[in-house]
Amino acid sequence: MINRLKTYSNLLNIQSKSFKNFLKIGIINELKKIQKIIHSNFEINFHINALKYKKPKLSSESCLIKNETYNIDIKIPMEIKYEGKIIFKKKYISFCKIPFMTEKGTFICNGNTRIIINQLIRSPGIYIKKKKNCLLATLIPKTGSWITIKRNKKKENFIKIDKINNSIPLFTFLNILGLSKKKITLSLNKNNYSKNFKISKKKKIEIPTINLTQLSKENNIKTIRNNLYNRFLNSDNYNLGDTGRFKINKKIYKTEFFTNKKILMPEDFLGIFNYMIKIKNINIKSNKIDDLKNKIVLSVGELMQNKFNNIIKDIYTKIIEKINKFEQKKKQEEKYNKEKKEEKIKINKTYFINSKNLTDNIKKFITTNPLSQLLNDLNPLSELTHKRKISTLGIGGIEKNKASTKIREIHNSHYGRICPIETSEGKNAGLVLSLAKDIRINKHGFIESPFYKVIKGNIKKNKGIFFISSENEKNIKIAPCDILKNFKLNKNYGVKNKNEFYYDSYKSINFISTSTDQFNSIGTGIIPFLEHNDANRVLMGATMQKQALILKNKEPSLIETGREILINRDSKSTIIAKESGTVIYSSSKKIIIQKKSKKSKFKNINLFKKYFKKKLKKNKKIKKHKHTIYLLNIDEKNNSNIYQTRTSIVKKNDWIKKGQIIAEGIGSLNGNLCLGKNILVGYLSWEGYNFEDAIIISERLRNEDILTSIHVKKCKSFLINHKEKKEEITKNIPDIKLKNVKNLNNNGIIKIGSKINGKEILIGIIKKRLINYEVELIYEILSEYERKNISVLSPKNLVGIVTNTKIHKIKNCYQIEIYITEKKKIQIGDKLSGRHGNKGVISKIIPIVDMPYLPDGTPIDIILNPLGIPSRMNVGQIYECLLNLSAINLKERYKIQPFDEYQYKNNSEILIYKKLNQSRKKTKKEWLFNPNNPGKTILFNGKNGKPFKQTISFGYSYILKLMHIAEEKIHAKTISNYSSIIKQPVKGKSKNGGQRFGEMEVWAIEGFGAAFLLQELLTIKSDDLHNKSQILKNLMNGLSMSKPNVPESFKLLILELQSLGLNINIFTKKKTLFTK
């Protein structure tokens, strides 16, 4: 528990802080293992204290453009001695390159933006488990073997190492470690010793790789001691880690012993045994594995340090191997060249350290690790929530297929630390979670949540905020925040103590939550009227917001919860001023701000003298740079096929304060989060078109580009730079009309700004045709050659504008990339959603004149099915819909705190009725608020102008257009690829695959009695290969169709049965149709 004044500082602080610790402490700690290597006649020294980091050669933006990796170079001074003589002087060598984290908390690897997810794993330490016949104490280290101490009913004590069946008596084990009988008896009370320490009669002891019955008596103890020393007392093979040592000290010692020892000590085993005796006497409950006090979070830095540790071990073994090879080679040379004089030994700096191999290993971790994923940057919310995910999967975590329901369930310790709502759906449910809003992670890796101090019923906000972990909740009682307004003395309140919830008096409360939505994640926290929805629908609402496309005409929501500004700030979609100053330049590429001038302490000193220059460089009060330059990202496609653009919102000579937004990203407007549009909605059934969550929309949404999104497609090609120039990019393409190449440059690449409509030439490429040598000689003499057109064409259905072209040189070839931007208007089959899990697919687009309209003649834009609300229990959409209606009429915006019912009963309803009444009075539209039917009015049918029989709910809802677009989903097989082995069409849209004529389709044709058509569909038109090849000849020559053969699919079935050992074949009267 540490006293803090602020609840949060930065939502991305977990990643950035962890990576900084890795660079400052983690790398140095790992390099200490190879600081001095002495082997044979060699002595290799790495001067770690003089370690340096070299800045990246390219900026993060240029790495994205050029498909490079954004990394830093580690430089270490290295010195090599041979037989006491220096053969390689102390010089800086390039040790390796590691990917460097950007300001956004991401890594750029091969031009792709990646993120490493936090991992939640079991904490190192002691775990007690009670069984019917015995008591088990398991010691889990950070790295090394697991140890289990078993105590049975007979009071016999054994030790097991890892998963080995044979156990070792504890007394024997302690003797081998070097503890005498006297020391064991002194550490335990005499009574405890006689009662609790019975010596086993077991004589045969087995330790991995050692069988004591096979050893002589003299070497017995020495060999075992060496084995145990290497397993548990050697820091290279065994490491408890800071957390493991902290937990052991806290459980078995009154004061912290061995704080700097990361290995097991013999005294630790005695302490654990003492602890087990106490537990047996007191009957303490066994440890709950799912409790957060038994779990730690490994962030980017810790995961990279674990990888770096493995790399260091490999380096050590390879250096020793190379030394041995060098010594063997030298001995062989000395045998043959005895008469020659001794030559100086020359060793290159790359002989022992190959920086390229080390860099590739680290790069492989970033690209192949299951916790490393491509950043989901569809919108600012999806980007931020992806960075705050926490996974129990991965290396050292839980296996997805073996995870039980107990592991997936919500635990009481999650309160205020892990969101109980937001999780992945499907197989990863309960395994991939999301961190709560205001949490932080302490130095041991435990999650802490903020609380206010309560003393004798008085809430002490002035004392600041206390961060408490699950471990520290043992002896305190915590109350929720909803008692703040109605906090009365002499009354019982709901409290949490030792992961249990019950009612207790106000005097017993020690801490209280800081806010009502403290337990929620960032995604669920921006859903207004959250408390009126079912938890499953809130989960859907959170996931739908992450799938929302940024629209062409952005619009913020009229109802917010206050977290939207934080999301824009910490997702780095906006640029924030680091210091106050005046704007002296502002454009689409950069913003320059002149800093506030400060008087120098050394104003009258002549700066031309070198002595003073060196002194002044160290003085912090002298400011070298008076201007701060903020580069706006060049238009660049992200992982989600959307342009990442930033636009300046400041002008020249504007005064800027520190922390002010100076440039906005794609998903923000005036600092507000923009994910959808406020659209007029009506809840009624309309001719069955909105049956089962289907959505009917007005033609206005399509015509006025209200739900139009912008997408980017990349087309690329490679040109090999060969001496013979077999391929060439040119505008002069044979047999192509001029109108088809009018948009190409002289280089043969399409111009920026050209319109694309269907299959058009993007890159004009010609290739030399392969001809016989005689004809080729004539072409060489005439300096001409036969040319073939292999130009790159745009996709068939792509309609857009060329916005960018790039050419990259990669070794002996050129990579040409063309970016085409297209508008995608709303259409039938597209998916829309609200913020309350109310999702659906568009079934019908209706003309404006046919849509139902309000009493003032305003046509409704979207018709939703009212039956979807009571069954799904997401009433929050109605609250939002009605409050939005009053917000538009009153021209106001609202911030609604989740769980605001604690202030007084029916708070949400009272607020909505109040605002609807105000809007009725202001606009003088009586139908806006009817006290008998609040939130409802009579709508009119657009087709005949008659009013509907009943009053209908209507209002403005914040509608999101999701990434599931019908145009991208539809796939039809025309002429596809076939598998060469099974002769069946390949699977999937990406391979242009298809399917056979299905079983239900066969039934349909059977129903119509079309026997000959069915025969053709299943044979000649499908996979009767022999007749398929003959059909064109027969049609051209006027011959009749040949009899159908057995299709390949049936032959495949026979082969499958034969592979099972069944002797099945196809026979006719004359011959076998199909042989093995």
Curated annotation (Swiss-Prot):
One of its GO terms (biological process) is DNA-templated transcription. It is found in: Plastid. GO terms for cellular component: DNA-directed RNA polymerase complex; mitochondrion; plastid. Its EC number is 2.7.7.6. Pfam families: RNA_pol_Rpb2_3, RNA_pol_Rpb2_6, RNA_pol_Rpb2_7. Keywords: DNA-directed RNA polymerase, Nucleotidyltransferase, Plastid, Transcription, Transferase. Its main location: plastid. Disulfide bonds: none annotated. It catalyses: RNA(n) + a ribonucleoside 5'-triphosphate = RNA(n+1) + diphosphate. In plastids the minimal PEP RNA polymerase catalytic core is composed of four subunits: alpha, beta, beta', and beta''. When a (nuclear-encoded) sigma factor is associated with the core the holoenzyme is formed, which can initiate transcription. DNA-dependent RNA polymerase catalyzes the transcription of DNA into RNA using the four ribonucleoside triphosphates as substrates. PANTHER family: DNA-DIRECTED RNA POLYMERASE I SUBUNIT 2 (PTHR20856). Belongs to the RNA polymerase beta chain family. This is DNA-directed RNA polymerase subunit beta. It comes from Euglena longa (Euglenophycean alga). The gene is rpoB.
